């Protein structure tokens, strides 16, 4: 389905932000959107405006390592990420961070730039380049690293696209983070819709043209190539081994336990939902291991 009109205004030629702005209004007010669907005539749907809260950032802490999951890049992503980091740093002695943008299809370019800026001190984040060599726009880091240079591992996969690739590519080029997982999608084009009206008709139509491409700080095009991880880790199954649960009774020929009946708690109930996820998410487990290893190495160098 395609939204082709919002109330009386055609959306052809509008940017995403402009179209979203047209949809906004007071809670409870009606809005009519016109939908185009294959093999059917355009039809109208009336909906009632309401508050929509999309939480694009989720966070957890395990073994003093902060986990930051970004599911999309919307207008609240930067503030959500900053709040998550602030809370994590306040309540824990953090060794490093895991940033997870797997299956993140992207979103707002401005938010991708701001999110990257949270982890960088300086330097270029991304550039857009058109056919004309003079048609170049560069986005640079403006703020200091909010995580104070702590070890950072970013997880990507084939579902990481657009804004996700901008973040991963910039952090990789500046050697600020280690990128793991699998090659990203490769959506690095800037597209513009040019509207026009068909002669002898009241219908508006348009042509969507690729007018520019995204480039990482090192000058690599994201389009069609994607971001190749520093360490390629396929998602797979593995047999979990938790050193916390290993004891002498697990050793061969160890002494028997006392004959007294022990009341054992169900270990599964002791694990948080996030710890259970670590048990089955191979890429995530390796990311935590990597942050732990880099943190230990850095401590030996101090």
Give residue ranges: language-model regions:
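Cleft-lining beta-strand/loop regions that shape enzyme active-site pockets
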Residues: 4-197
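Short acidic, Pro/Gly- and aromatic-enriched capping/linker segments at domain boundaries
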Residues: 196, 203-213
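Beta-strand scaffold of nucleotide-dependent catalytic cores
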Residues: 45-47, 209-210, 219
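Conserved functional hotspot residues or short segments at active or partner-binding sites
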Residues: 213-302
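Aromatic-patch recognition
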Residues: 189-191, 208-211, 223
């Amino acid at each position: 389905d395609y939204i082709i009109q919002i109330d009386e205004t055609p959306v052809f030629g509008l940017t995403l932000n402009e179209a979203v702005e047209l949809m906004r209004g007071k809670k409870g007010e009606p809005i009519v959107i016109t939908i185009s669907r294959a093999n059917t005539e355009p039809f109208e749907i009336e909906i009632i405006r309401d508050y929509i809260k999309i939480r694009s950032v989720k966070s957890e802490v395990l073994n003093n390592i902060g986990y930051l999951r970004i599911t999309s890049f919307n207008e609240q992503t930067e503030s959500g990420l900053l709040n998550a980091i602030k809370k994590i740093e306040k309540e824990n002695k953090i060794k490093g961070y895991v940033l997870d943008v797997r299956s993140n299809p992207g979103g707002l370019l401005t938010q991708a730039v701001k999110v990257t800026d949270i982890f960088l001190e300086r330097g270029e984040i991304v550039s857009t380049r058109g056919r004309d060599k003079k048609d170049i726009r560069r986005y640079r880091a403006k703020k200091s690293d909010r995580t104070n240079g702590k070890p950072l591992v970013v997880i990507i996969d084939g579902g990481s696209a657009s804004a996700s690739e901008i973040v991963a590519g910039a952090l990789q080029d500046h050697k600020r983070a280690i990128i793991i997982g699998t090659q990203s999608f490769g959506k690095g084009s800037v597209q513009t819709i040019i509207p026009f009206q068909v002669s002898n008709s009241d219908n508006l139509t348009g042509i969507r043209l690729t007018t520019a491409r995204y480039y990482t700080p090192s000058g690599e095009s994201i389009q069609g190539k994607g971001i190749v991880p520093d360490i390629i880790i396929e998602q797979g199954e593995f047999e979990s081994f938790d050193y916390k649960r290993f004891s002498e009774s697990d050793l061969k020929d160890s002494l028997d336990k006392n004959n007294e009946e022990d009341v054992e708690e169900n270990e599964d109930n002791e694990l948080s939902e996030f710890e259970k996820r670590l048990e089955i998410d191979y890429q995530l487990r390796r990311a935590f291991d990597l942050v732990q290893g880099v943190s230990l190495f850095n401590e030996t160098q101090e």
